[in-house]
Protein backbone atom coordinates (compact mmCIF):
# COMPACT_ATOMS: atom_id res chain seq x y z
CA UNK A 1 0.00 0.00 0.00
CA UNK A 2 1.44 3.36 -1.03
CA UNK A 3 1.96 6.16 1.48
CA UNK A 4 0.27 9.50 0.83
CA UNK A 5 2.50 12.56 1.06
CA UNK A 6 1.62 15.66 3.03
CA UNK A 7 1.29 18.62 0.70
CA UNK A 8 2.75 22.06 1.39
CA UNK A 9 -0.77 23.52 1.62
CA UNK A 10 -1.71 20.97 4.29
CA UNK A 11 1.43 21.80 6.25
CA UNK A 12 0.84 25.56 5.97
CA UNK A 13 -2.79 25.32 7.11
CA UNK A 14 -1.75 23.17 10.07
CA UNK A 15 1.07 25.57 10.97
CA UNK A 16 -1.39 28.47 10.90
CA UNK A 17 -3.83 26.56 13.10
CA UNK A 18 -1.11 25.82 15.66
CA UNK A 19 0.03 29.45 15.59
CA UNK A 20 -3.48 30.75 16.28
CA UNK A 21 -4.01 28.29 19.12
CA UNK A 22 -0.76 29.37 20.80
CA UNK A 23 -1.36 33.12 20.59
CA UNK A 24 -2.61 34.78 23.79
CA UNK A 25 -2.53 38.59 23.61
CA UNK A 26 -2.69 38.65 19.82
CA UNK A 27 -5.82 36.52 19.85
CA UNK A 28 -7.71 39.20 21.81
CA UNK A 29 -6.74 42.32 19.85
CA UNK A 30 -7.96 43.76 16.55
CA UNK A 31 -6.43 41.62 13.81
CA UNK A 32 -6.39 43.16 10.37
CA UNK A 33 -5.25 41.53 7.16
CA UNK A 34 -4.29 43.59 4.14
CA UNK A 35 -4.40 41.73 0.82
CA UNK A 36 -3.14 44.71 -1.21
CA UNK A 37 0.36 43.18 -1.12
CA UNK A 38 -0.81 39.75 -2.26
CA UNK A 39 0.75 40.03 -5.71
CA UNK A 40 4.01 41.89 -5.19
CA UNK A 41 4.56 41.03 -1.54
CA UNK A 42 4.86 43.38 1.41
CA UNK A 43 8.10 44.62 2.85
CA UNK A 44 9.14 45.99 6.22
CA UNK A 45 8.30 49.68 6.20
CA UNK A 46 5.04 49.24 4.28
CA UNK A 47 2.21 51.11 5.99
CA UNK A 48 -1.51 50.76 6.53
CA UNK A 49 -3.50 53.96 7.13
CA UNK A 50 -6.27 53.69 9.73
CA UNK A 51 -9.02 56.27 10.10
CA UNK A 52 -10.00 57.27 13.65
CA UNK A 53 -13.56 58.30 14.63
CA UNK A 54 -14.52 61.93 14.00
CA UNK A 55 -15.19 64.15 17.03
CA UNK A 56 -17.09 67.44 17.22
CA UNK A 57 -18.32 70.00 19.75
CA UNK A 58 -22.02 70.17 20.66
CA UNK A 59 -23.32 73.77 20.54
CA UNK A 60 -26.34 75.42 22.17
CA UNK A 61 -28.98 77.63 20.61
CA UNK A 62 -30.88 77.88 17.34
CA UNK A 63 -28.03 79.40 15.33
CA UNK A 64 -26.09 76.86 13.29
CA UNK A 65 -22.39 76.66 14.03
CA UNK A 66 -20.67 74.66 11.30
CA UNK A 67 -17.49 72.88 12.34
CA UNK A 68 -14.69 71.55 10.20
CA UNK A 69 -14.19 67.81 10.17
CA UNK A 70 -11.79 66.55 12.81
CA UNK A 71 -10.78 63.45 10.94
CA UNK A 72 -7.75 61.76 12.42
CA UNK A 73 -5.60 59.05 10.96
CA UNK A 74 -2.97 56.82 12.44
CA UNK A 75 -0.40 54.86 10.51
CA UNK A 76 0.26 51.22 11.20
CA UNK A 77 3.70 50.25 9.96
CA UNK A 78 4.68 46.73 8.94
CA UNK A 79 7.65 46.81 11.27
CA UNK A 80 8.88 43.25 11.65
CA UNK A 81 9.07 39.94 9.84
CA UNK A 82 8.99 36.96 12.16
CA UNK A 83 10.20 33.59 10.98
CA UNK A 84 11.43 30.32 12.35
CA UNK A 85 13.51 27.70 10.57
CA UNK A 86 12.83 23.97 10.53
CA UNK A 87 14.16 20.97 8.66
CA UNK A 88 11.92 18.10 7.64
CA UNK A 89 12.72 15.28 5.29
CA UNK A 90 10.73 13.59 2.55
CA UNK A 91 10.35 10.62 4.88
CA UNK A 92 8.64 12.81 7.47
CA UNK A 93 6.17 13.93 4.80
CA UNK A 94 4.76 10.38 4.83
CA UNK A 95 3.60 10.78 8.46
CA UNK A 96 0.01 11.46 9.44
CA UNK A 97 -0.65 15.20 9.63
CA UNK A 98 -1.28 15.19 13.41
CA UNK A 99 1.91 13.20 14.04
CA UNK A 100 3.88 15.54 11.80
CA UNK A 101 2.44 18.56 13.58
CA UNK A 102 3.26 17.17 17.03
CA UNK A 103 6.81 16.18 16.12
CA UNK A 104 7.90 18.89 13.70
CA UNK A 105 5.64 21.94 13.84
CA UNK A 106 4.40 22.48 17.41
CA UNK A 107 7.79 22.91 19.14
CA UNK A 108 8.83 25.64 16.69
CA UNK A 109 5.48 27.35 16.10
CA UNK A 110 4.90 27.83 19.84
CA UNK A 111 8.11 29.89 19.98
CA UNK A 112 6.98 31.93 16.97
CA UNK A 113 3.67 32.63 18.73
CA UNK A 114 5.45 33.78 21.89
CA UNK A 115 7.61 36.15 19.85
CA UNK A 116 4.56 37.64 18.12
CA UNK A 117 2.77 38.04 21.46
CA UNK A 118 5.85 39.79 22.87
CA UNK A 119 5.74 42.32 20.03
CA UNK A 120 2.07 43.02 20.70
CA UNK A 121 2.71 43.31 24.46
CA UNK A 122 5.35 45.93 23.67
CA UNK A 123 2.52 48.30 22.74
CA UNK A 124 2.41 49.21 26.45
CA UNK A 125 4.90 51.96 25.52
CA UNK A 126 2.05 53.81 23.81
CA UNK A 127 -0.47 53.38 26.64
CA UNK A 128 -0.72 56.39 28.94
CA UNK A 129 -3.15 55.11 31.58
CA UNK A 130 -1.98 53.04 34.52
CA UNK A 131 -3.54 51.75 37.75
CA UNK A 132 -2.29 49.93 40.81
CA UNK A 133 0.95 50.41 42.72
CA UNK A 134 4.20 49.82 40.81
CA UNK A 135 6.01 46.84 42.30
CA UNK A 136 2.89 45.44 43.99
CA UNK A 137 1.47 42.29 42.39
CA UNK A 138 -2.31 42.64 41.81
CA UNK A 139 -4.22 40.36 44.18
CA UNK A 140 -7.68 41.93 44.56
CA UNK A 141 -10.59 42.91 42.35
CA UNK A 142 -9.84 46.61 42.98
CA UNK A 143 -7.06 46.90 40.40
CA UNK A 144 -9.26 45.32 37.70
CA UNK A 145 -12.14 47.61 38.61
CA UNK A 146 -9.84 50.64 38.57
CA UNK A 147 -8.66 49.64 35.10
CA UNK A 148 -12.29 49.42 34.01
CA UNK A 149 -12.85 52.85 35.57
CA UNK A 150 -10.08 54.32 33.40
CA UNK A 151 -11.62 52.77 30.28
CA UNK A 152 -15.07 54.07 31.22
CA UNK A 153 -13.78 57.59 31.88
CA UNK A 154 -12.15 57.45 28.46
CA UNK A 155 -15.51 56.48 26.90
CA UNK A 156 -14.15 53.15 25.70
CA UNK A 157 -16.74 50.73 24.33
CA UNK A 158 -17.91 48.37 27.07
CA UNK A 159 -17.38 45.13 25.19
CA UNK A 160 -15.29 43.22 24.38
CA UNK A 161 -12.65 44.03 27.00
CA UNK A 162 -9.80 41.74 28.00
CA UNK A 163 -7.01 41.47 30.55
CA UNK A 164 -3.69 39.77 29.91
CA UNK A 165 -1.37 39.41 32.89
CA UNK A 166 1.96 37.80 33.71
CA UNK A 167 2.23 34.56 35.75
CA UNK A 168 2.76 36.44 39.05
CA UNK A 169 -0.34 38.60 38.60
CA UNK A 170 -2.35 35.58 37.49
CA UNK A 171 -1.37 33.71 40.66
CA UNK A 172 -2.19 36.74 42.83
CA UNK A 173 -5.59 37.33 41.23
CA UNK A 174 -6.68 33.67 41.31
CA UNK A 175 -5.71 33.42 44.98
CA UNK A 176 -7.22 36.79 45.88
CA UNK A 177 -10.52 36.30 44.07
CA UNK A 178 -11.15 32.60 44.67
CA UNK A 179 -14.70 31.95 45.77
CA UNK A 180 -15.71 35.62 46.01
CA UNK A 181 -19.25 35.61 44.62
CA UNK A 182 -18.05 33.65 41.62
CA UNK A 183 -20.34 31.27 39.73
CA UNK A 184 -19.65 27.60 40.38
CA UNK A 185 -18.22 27.00 36.90
CA UNK A 186 -15.82 29.95 37.31
CA UNK A 187 -14.56 28.59 40.64
CA UNK A 188 -14.20 25.17 39.02
CA UNK A 189 -12.06 26.58 36.20
CA UNK A 190 -9.90 28.49 38.67
CA UNK A 191 -9.32 25.35 40.74
CA UNK A 192 -8.67 23.04 37.79
CA UNK A 193 -6.64 25.35 35.55
CA UNK A 194 -5.20 27.96 37.92
CA UNK A 195 -6.55 30.67 35.59
CA UNK A 196 -9.20 33.36 36.05
CA UNK A 197 -11.01 32.38 32.85
CA UNK A 198 -13.94 34.10 31.17
CA UNK A 199 -16.62 36.56 32.22
CA UNK A 200 -14.88 38.18 35.21
CA UNK A 201 -15.73 41.70 36.44
CA UNK A 202 -16.91 42.90 33.04
CA UNK A 203 -13.97 41.38 31.17
CA UNK A 204 -14.51 38.80 28.45
CA UNK A 205 -11.38 36.95 29.51
CA UNK A 206 -8.47 37.26 31.91
CA UNK A 207 -5.54 35.45 30.31
CA UNK A 208 -2.04 34.62 31.49
CA UNK A 209 0.88 35.22 29.14
CA UNK A 210 4.60 34.77 29.62
CA UNK A 211 5.12 37.44 26.94
CA UNK A 212 4.04 40.36 29.17
CA UNK A 213 6.84 42.93 29.15
CA UNK A 214 8.94 44.30 31.99
CA UNK A 215 9.46 48.05 31.73
CA UNK A 216 12.64 49.63 33.09
CA UNK A 217 12.04 53.23 34.07
CA UNK A 218 14.47 56.02 33.24
CA UNK A 219 17.19 57.14 35.64
CA UNK A 220 15.26 60.38 36.40
CA UNK A 221 15.40 61.23 40.11
CA UNK A 222 14.55 64.23 42.25
CA UNK A 223 11.83 66.83 41.75
CA UNK A 224 10.61 67.77 38.27
CA UNK A 225 8.55 70.68 37.03
CA UNK A 226 7.27 72.01 33.71
CA UNK A 227 9.69 74.64 32.39
CA UNK A 228 7.50 76.24 29.72
CA UNK A 229 3.74 76.86 29.78
CA UNK A 230 1.90 74.94 27.05
CA UNK A 231 -0.46 77.12 25.02
CA UNK A 232 -0.89 75.32 21.69
CA UNK A 233 -3.78 72.94 20.99
CA UNK A 234 -2.53 69.53 19.92
CA UNK A 235 0.98 69.96 21.31
CA UNK A 236 2.61 66.56 21.80
CA UNK A 237 5.87 67.65 23.45
CA UNK A 238 6.70 69.19 26.80
CA UNK A 239 9.78 70.63 28.51
CA UNK A 240 10.63 69.37 31.99
CA UNK A 241 13.43 70.16 34.43
CA UNK A 242 16.15 67.50 34.61
CA UNK A 243 19.42 66.74 36.32
CA UNK A 244 22.79 66.00 34.72
CA UNK A 245 22.44 63.42 31.97
CA UNK A 246 19.64 61.44 33.57
CA UNK A 247 17.09 59.81 31.27
CA UNK A 248 13.38 59.41 30.73
CA UNK A 249 12.54 56.09 29.10
CA UNK A 250 9.93 55.48 26.42
CA UNK A 251 6.98 54.05 28.34
CA UNK A 252 7.49 56.16 31.48
CA UNK A 253 4.17 57.54 32.76
CA UNK A 254 3.73 60.85 34.59
CA UNK A 255 1.14 63.37 35.74
CA UNK A 256 1.22 67.18 35.87
CA UNK A 257 -0.20 69.10 38.81
CA UNK A 258 -3.64 70.66 38.14
CA UNK A 259 -3.94 69.06 34.69
CA UNK A 260 -6.97 66.78 34.86
CA UNK A 261 -8.26 64.24 32.36
CA UNK A 262 -11.59 64.88 30.66
CA UNK A 263 -14.25 62.51 29.42
CA UNK A 264 -14.03 62.64 25.60
CA UNK A 265 -17.83 62.66 25.28
CA UNK A 266 -18.72 65.34 27.85
CA UNK A 267 -15.33 67.14 27.89
CA UNK A 268 -15.72 67.57 31.64
CA UNK A 269 -13.03 66.73 34.18
CA UNK A 270 -13.02 63.17 35.47
CA UNK A 271 -11.47 64.35 38.73
CA UNK A 272 -8.31 62.35 38.02
CA UNK A 273 -5.02 63.84 36.90
CA UNK A 274 -4.34 63.11 33.24
CA UNK A 275 -1.58 60.57 32.80
CA UNK A 276 0.91 60.99 29.97
CA UNK A 277 3.31 58.44 28.52
CA UNK A 278 6.72 59.26 27.10
CA UNK A 279 6.85 57.93 23.53
CA UNK A 280 10.56 58.46 22.88
CA UNK A 281 13.52 58.29 25.26
CA UNK A 282 14.96 61.65 26.29
CA UNK A 283 18.22 62.61 28.02
CA UNK A 284 18.56 65.67 30.24
CA UNK A 285 20.93 68.41 29.13
CA UNK A 286 21.55 71.83 30.60
CA UNK A 287 19.17 71.16 33.48
CA UNK A 288 16.16 70.14 31.37
CA UNK A 289 14.51 67.46 29.29
CA UNK A 290 13.71 69.35 26.09
CA UNK A 291 10.82 68.52 23.75
CA UNK A 292 9.83 65.32 25.52
CA UNK A 293 7.47 63.47 23.16
CA UNK A 294 4.26 62.46 24.90
CA UNK A 295 0.85 60.88 24.38
CA UNK A 296 -1.93 61.90 24.42
CA UNK A 297 -1.49 65.21 22.63
CA UNK A 298 -2.67 68.16 24.73
CA UNK A 299 -6.10 69.53 23.79
CA UNK A 300 -8.20 71.52 26.27
CA UNK A 301 -11.96 71.29 26.74
CA UNK A 302 -12.48 74.07 24.18
CA UNK A 303 -11.37 71.67 21.44
CA UNK A 304 -13.32 68.76 19.97
CA UNK A 305 -10.34 66.47 20.62
CA UNK A 306 -10.12 67.42 24.31
CA UNK A 307 -7.79 65.37 26.53
CA UNK A 308 -7.25 67.78 29.49
CA UNK A 309 -9.22 70.47 31.30
CA UNK A 310 -6.40 73.05 31.13
CA UNK A 311 -2.94 73.60 29.69
CA UNK A 312 0.11 72.66 31.81
CA UNK A 313 1.59 75.76 33.43
CA UNK A 314 5.22 76.67 33.98
CA UNK A 315 6.55 75.39 37.34
CA UNK A 316 3.73 72.80 37.65
CA UNK A 317 5.03 69.71 39.46
CA UNK A 318 5.62 66.63 37.30
CA UNK A 319 5.29 63.28 39.09
CA UNK A 320 6.61 60.11 37.48
CA UNK A 321 5.03 56.74 38.17
CA UNK A 322 7.36 54.30 39.91
CA UNK A 323 10.93 54.63 41.12
CA UNK A 324 13.87 55.48 38.88
CA UNK A 325 15.80 52.69 37.11
CA UNK A 326 13.39 50.01 38.28
CA UNK A 327 11.69 47.15 36.43
CA UNK A 328 7.90 46.79 36.58
CA UNK A 329 5.66 44.28 34.76
CA UNK A 330 3.22 45.83 32.28
CA UNK A 331 0.00 43.85 32.69
CA UNK A 332 -2.70 44.97 30.28
CA UNK A 333 -6.46 45.65 30.45
CA UNK A 334 -7.88 46.85 27.14
CA UNK A 335 -10.71 46.97 24.65
CA UNK A 336 -10.13 44.76 21.64
CA UNK A 337 -9.74 47.74 19.28
CA UNK A 338 -7.16 49.50 21.48
CA UNK A 339 -4.39 47.43 19.89
CA UNK A 340 -4.21 46.41 16.24
CA UNK A 341 -2.17 43.54 14.87
CA UNK A 342 -1.92 43.58 11.08
CA UNK A 343 -0.35 41.07 8.75
CA UNK A 344 0.26 41.28 5.02
CA UNK A 345 1.02 38.69 2.37
CA UNK A 346 4.63 37.84 1.75
CA UNK A 347 5.73 37.16 -1.81
CA UNK A 348 5.60 33.51 -2.85
CA UNK A 349 9.01 32.80 -4.41
CA UNK A 350 9.29 30.88 -7.67
CA UNK A 351 11.60 27.97 -8.41
CA UNK A 352 11.69 26.55 -4.89
CA UNK A 353 10.92 23.02 -3.71
CA UNK A 354 7.73 24.00 -1.88
CA UNK A 355 5.90 27.26 -1.16
CA UNK A 356 2.46 28.06 0.22
CA UNK A 357 0.66 30.99 1.82
CA UNK A 358 -2.55 30.77 3.85
CA UNK A 359 -4.75 33.36 5.58
CA UNK A 360 -7.15 32.76 8.47
CA UNK A 361 -8.72 35.07 11.07
CA UNK A 362 -6.58 38.01 10.01
CA UNK A 363 -3.23 36.21 10.01
CA UNK A 364 -1.23 35.52 6.86
CA UNK A 365 1.46 32.84 7.11
CA UNK A 366 3.95 31.61 4.51
CA UNK A 367 5.91 28.35 4.40
CA UNK A 368 8.82 27.91 1.96
CA UNK A 369 11.18 24.94 1.57
CA UNK A 370 14.25 24.85 -0.65
CA UNK A 371 17.06 22.42 -1.32
CA UNK A 372 20.54 23.20 0.01
CA UNK A 373 22.63 21.14 -2.39
CA UNK A 374 25.92 22.15 -0.74
CA UNK A 375 24.97 20.66 2.62
CA UNK A 376 22.46 18.02 1.50
CA UNK A 377 19.71 19.61 3.56
CA UNK A 378 16.13 20.76 2.94
CA UNK A 379 15.73 23.90 5.10
CA UNK A 380 12.24 25.30 5.55
CA UNK A 381 11.17 28.68 6.89
CA UNK A 382 7.83 29.75 8.33
CA UNK A 383 7.17 33.51 8.08
CA UNK A 384 4.65 36.03 9.37
CA UNK A 385 4.92 39.71 8.33
Region locations from a protein language model:
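N-terminal "assembly arms/tails" that initiate or stabilize quaternary assembly
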Residues: 1-74
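A generic local secondary-structure boundary/capping motif
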Residues: 37-39, 148-154, 191-198, 227, ...
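Long, contiguous amphipathic alpha-helices that act as assembly "spine/axial" helices in icosahedral shell
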Residues: 50, 76-143, 152-169, 193-208, ...
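Short, flexible loop/turn elements at secondary-structure junctions
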Residues: 54, 167-169, 282
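Exposed beta-sheet edge/beta-hairpin loop segments within beta-rich domains
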Residues: 97-99, 239-244, 367-374
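Autoprocessing Asn-cyclization modules and mimics
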Residues: 172-295
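Internal mixed-charge
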Residues: 193, 210, 274-275, 279-385
Amino acid sequence: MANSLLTIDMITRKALEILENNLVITRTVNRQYDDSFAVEGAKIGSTLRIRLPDRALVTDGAALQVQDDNEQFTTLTVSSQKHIGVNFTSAELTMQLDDFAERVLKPRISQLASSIDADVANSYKSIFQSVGTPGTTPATSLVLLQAQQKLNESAAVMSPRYATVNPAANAGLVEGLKGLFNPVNTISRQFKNGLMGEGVLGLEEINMSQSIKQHTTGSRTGAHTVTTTVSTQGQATINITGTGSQTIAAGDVFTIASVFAVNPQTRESTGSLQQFVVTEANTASGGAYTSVKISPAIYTSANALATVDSFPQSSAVVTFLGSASTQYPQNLVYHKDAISFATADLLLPQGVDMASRQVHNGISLRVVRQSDINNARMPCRIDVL
